Amino acid sequence: MDLNKLHELLGEEYVIMYKLHPLLKNHIISNHPNIICCNSENLYHLFSITDYFISDYSAIIFDFSIMNKPMIFYAFDLDKYKEETGIFLDYLNEMPGPVCYNEEEVANSILADEFDLSKIEVFCRKYHKYNDGHSLSRVLTLIKDIMSKDGA
């Protein structure tokens, strides 16, 4: 993605923070003061200050989805990626946010700010079914079951 172009489309009131894949961590994409490289930052710390999360096919979306914040999926090469790498889910129907193919579509999604957060809730129910506040209870039940089978 051309972050300079995206920033130009969004305007000066927007700050773009980016963190590249670890294999690309030494790359600097832009020297613009409102386009900030966060490659050395903890990704999970960035989640809390992020208004919109833009990703491609990264599994990090599963972690970010718990934040219940808008996500945009940049899939400029979706057909090629499906063919060469493969995707285990129905990308166009399951992504909990707009799928965009260029910087203009990404910018328009942000500027319109009309995200359906209920799609994220559906996504989380499917992929985070145990994130329900009852994990400790399940672990205790499992421990008790194991202990009772072992005669403890």
Locate each region found by the language model.
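C-terminal alpha-helical cap of glycosyltransferases
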Residues: 132-152
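Donor nucleotide-activated moiety binding/catalytic core segment of transferases
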Residues: 20-62
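Hydrophobic/aromatic beta-strand patches that form the interior of the parallel beta-sheet core
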Residues: 17, 36, 52-54, 72, ...
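Short, well-ordered alpha-helix to beta-strand connector turns
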Residues: 13-14, 50, 68
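Conserved catalytic-core segment of nucleotide-activated headgroup transferases in glycan assembly
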Residues: 1-28, 100, 137
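Catalytic binding pocket for nucleotide-activated donors in carbohydrate/polymer assembly enzymes
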Residues: 29-31, 59-127
